[in-house]
């Protein structure tokens, strides 16, 4: 039995709760198998008092979505002086805001798609840019709320303004880039292998279901790309990780249009999924690391003041 007591934070109350429970359970299982004393914590509004009672040596952050990866839980852990995994307060908050993250990443020479941040009600009145374009909640993950507006389509007013929209009122609208979906993980200060995502044909893109349903997508890792494009994806992933100030692990998503040669950075994820169908474990495996290796590395990398 190892000496450290690890609290695995999971669940929470974001729309990605089920994903977080899956990630957290898998990580907790591995940590227990490695001999750590593990407390599985389903995060709620009393998390500070729960952690004060548990007095863990390390908090393993397996939360996803608002509160879990936007700087708030990180602030609680800093206040309680509990070392934790993944990025710190500032980087988490910045990465979660897709609009601001794009500005920072573009400032270090990373190619991004033209975009604008606006109210969802304004999008519902007229096209904010010439279609095709993509509408996303500015602070959500797992492709939740993503709408693709194709050429010659009308304004998607019911989807964005209607009562079925359950996300925040601010959205980011960006030019739709056709082509291949690529992603690259960073671990510490090293870019790992590039992975291509091939959603099953009945999925329009790599959405929530294709991410988490068994057989929803195929992960080709390493991706079959020219050495120039492959290295550019790695370079931009590391540049984004460093510009935003990420710590631990991150994963950047890209679109590559083979016809034009355009390679565009889309967004960064500071809390990559660790579910059985997640990308990050597959990327790490291609680099010669087991699931247990990466979980162990995250624990050893944990600290405050990240």
UniProtKB/Swiss-Prot annotation:
Gene3D superfamilies: 3.40.50.20, ATP-grasp fold, A domain, ATP-grasp fold, B domain. Binds 2 magnesium or manganese ions per subunit. Coiled coil: none annotated. Pathway: Cell wall biogenesis; peptidoglycan biosynthesis. Disulfide bonds: none annotated. ATP binds at residues 128-183. Keywords: ATP-binding, Cell shape, Cell wall biogenesis/degradation, Cytoplasm, Ligase, Magnesium, Manganese, Metal-binding, Nucleotide-binding, Peptidoglycan synthesis. It comes from the Bacteria. It catalyses: 2 D-alanine + ATP = D-alanyl-D-alanine + ADP + phosphate + H(+). Its EC number is 6.3.2.4. Its cofactor is Mg(2+); Mn(2+). Its main location: cytoplasm. GO terms for cellular component: cytoplasm. GO terms for biological process: cell wall organization; peptidoglycan biosynthetic process; regulation of cell shape. Belongs to the D-alanine--D-alanine ligase family. PANTHER family: D-ALANINE--D-ALANINE LIGASE, D-ALANINE--D-ALANINE LIGASE B. HAMAP family: Dala_Dala_lig. This is D-alanine--D-alanine ligase. It comes from Bartonella henselae (strain ATCC 49882 / DSM 28221 / CCUG 30454 / Houston 1). The gene is ddl.
């Amino acid at each position: 039995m190892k000496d450290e007591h690890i609290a695995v934070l999971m669940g929470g109350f974001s729309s990605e709760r089920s994903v977080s429970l899956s990630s957290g359970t898998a990580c907790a299982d591995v940590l227990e198998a490695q001999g750590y004393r593990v407390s599985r914590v389903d995060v709620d509004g009393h998390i500070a008092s729960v952690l004060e009672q548990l007095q863990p040596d390390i908090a393993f952050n397996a939360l996803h979505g608002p509160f879990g990866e936007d700087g708030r839980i990180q602030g609680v852990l800093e206040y309680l002086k509990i070392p934790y995994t993944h990025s710190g307060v500032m980087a988490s908050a910045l990465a979660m805001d897709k609009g601001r993250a794009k500005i920072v990443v573009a400032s270090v020479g990373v190619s991004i798609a033209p975009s604008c941040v606006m109210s969802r009600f304004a999008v519902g009145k007229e096209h904010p840019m010439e279609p095709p374009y993509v509408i996303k909640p500015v602070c959500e993950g797992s492709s939740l709320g993503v709408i693709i507006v194709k050429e010659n389509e009308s304004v998607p007013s019911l989807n964005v303004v209607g009562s079925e929209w359950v996300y925040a009122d601010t959205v980011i609208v960006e030019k739709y880039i056709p082509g291949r979906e690529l992603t690259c993980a960073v671990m510490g200060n090293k870019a790992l292998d590039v992975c291509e995502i091939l959603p099953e044909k009945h999925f329009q893109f790599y959405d929530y279901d294709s991410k988490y349903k068994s057989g929803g997508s195929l992960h080709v890792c390493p991706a079959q790309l020219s050495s120039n494009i492959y290295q550019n994806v790695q370079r931009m992933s590391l540049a984004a990780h460093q510009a935003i100030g990420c710590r631990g692990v991150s994963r950047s998503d890209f679109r590559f249009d083979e016809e034009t040669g355009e390679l565009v950075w889309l967004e960064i994820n500071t809390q990559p999924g660790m579910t059985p169908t997640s990308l990050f474990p597959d990327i790490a495996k291609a680099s010669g690391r087991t699931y247990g290796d990466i979980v162990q590395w995250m624990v050893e990398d944990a600290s405050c003041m990240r």
